[in-house]
Amino acid sequence: MEMTTRTLPSRKRIALVAHDHRKQALLEWVSSNKPQLSEHQLYATGTTGNLIHSATGIPVHCMLSGPMGGDQQVGALIAEGKIDMLVFFWDPLNAVPHDPDVKALLRLATVWNIPVANNRATADFLISSPMFATEMRIAIPDYQRYLNERLI
């Protein structure tokens, strides 16, 4: 597939997602990075977003709960270019009923080439990067070209 680019803005739109057994770890990470995260737009699946807002006071755009379609809503925003970074603390030791949605979310984040953190160490690397609060160009699939080729 041909590629094009898009610019991630300096004020990022960050999706925050966590499985039940990882919510506390994500809350701790958000709390310890509140000053940096407050400068960006936060999105989250339902339960996670409400917990983050209650614990930190940071505004969060809440989707549905993950099992009710929230993971797919976040994935759709990624595909539309409306999410610039994903922090997803998923539980590698417990299966969840919506595992296919989780795989689809991670696949879309990879297809659309956005930064993804699956654990605290990676999230710390991303938030401490000089690129975190600056514009950054990324390569993405050229969907319009792909569509045009398929319609010929």
Swiss-Prot record:
UniProt-listed Enzyme Commission number(s): 4.2.3.3
This protein's GO CC annotations: cytosol
Family matches, as InterPro entries: Methylgl_synth, Methylglyoxal_synth_AS, MGS-like_dom, MGS-like_dom_sf
Keywords: Lyase
Enzyme class name: lyase
Positions of the MGS-like domain: 6-152
Catalytic residues of the enzyme: D71 (proton donor/acceptor)
Protein name: Methylglyoxal synthase
Organism: Edwardsiella ictaluri (strain 93-146)
Lineage: Bacteria, Pseudomonadati, Pseudomonadota, Gammaproteobacteria, Enterobacterales
